[in-house]
Amino acid sequence: MADIQAEKAFQKQQVSFKNRFQLKASKGKEGIRYYKNIGLGYRTPKDAIEGTYIDKKCPFTSDVSIRGAILRGTVISTKMRRTLVVRRNYLHYIKKYNRFEKRHSNIPAHVSPAFNVKEGDSVTIGQCRPLSKTVRFNVIKHDISAASKKQFKAF
């Protein structure tokens, strides 16, 4: 949340929700802050309501809508700015041998400054419009430290 004005141009919150969602505003010392409830049973984080960050790709404070697939996975990389890589492990059935094999997929997702995500944490990501060349998902829920749970590692 320290990168409030990290860009060269002055950043301000865009208010164009087009009446699709219930628009809410909170008045703070910085002025009026707009946020919305994304629905689907997910709550708006407290940092999105009370924070001062400006992110045009945040599902809670901008006009990005969550639609389509909702997935869960483990964070394996946070090296990109406001983007992380989520690993999803799954089993694939091989009919010839009547057995399953372990597979995985890496999904890049945008993370809002409202979440303080570290590697190894479990996150829920929701599909949205394409945000860049490879990013089509947005973090909508953060569960701290999935390392304590039993899971299979990279093979």
Swiss-Prot record:
* Gene3D superfamilies xrefs: 2.40.50.1000
Report the record's Gene Ontology biological process terms.
Answer: translation
Q: Which SUPFAM superfamilies match?
A: Nucleic acid-binding proteins
List modified residues, type N-acetylalanine.
Answer: 2
GO molecular function terms listed in the Swiss-Prot or TrEMBL record: structural constituent of ribosome
- Which InterPro entries does the annotation name? NA-bd_OB-fold, Ribosomal_uS17, Ribosomal_uS17_arc/euk, Ribosomal_uS17_CS, Ribosomal_uS17_N
Q: Is Ribonucleoprotein given among the entry's keywords? A: yes
Question: What are the UniProt keywords, alphabetically?
Answer: Acetylation, Ribonucleoprotein, Ribosomal protein
Q: Name one GO cellular component term.
A: cytosolic small ribosomal subunit
Among PANTHER family, the record links this protein to: 40S RIBOSOMAL PROTEIN S11 FAMILY MEMBER, 40S RIBOSOMAL PROTEIN S11-RELATED
Query: What does the similarity note say?
Result: Belongs to the universal ribosomal protein uS17 family.
Name of the protein described by the UniProt record: Small ribosomal subunit protein uS17
Species of the source: Dictyostelium discoideum
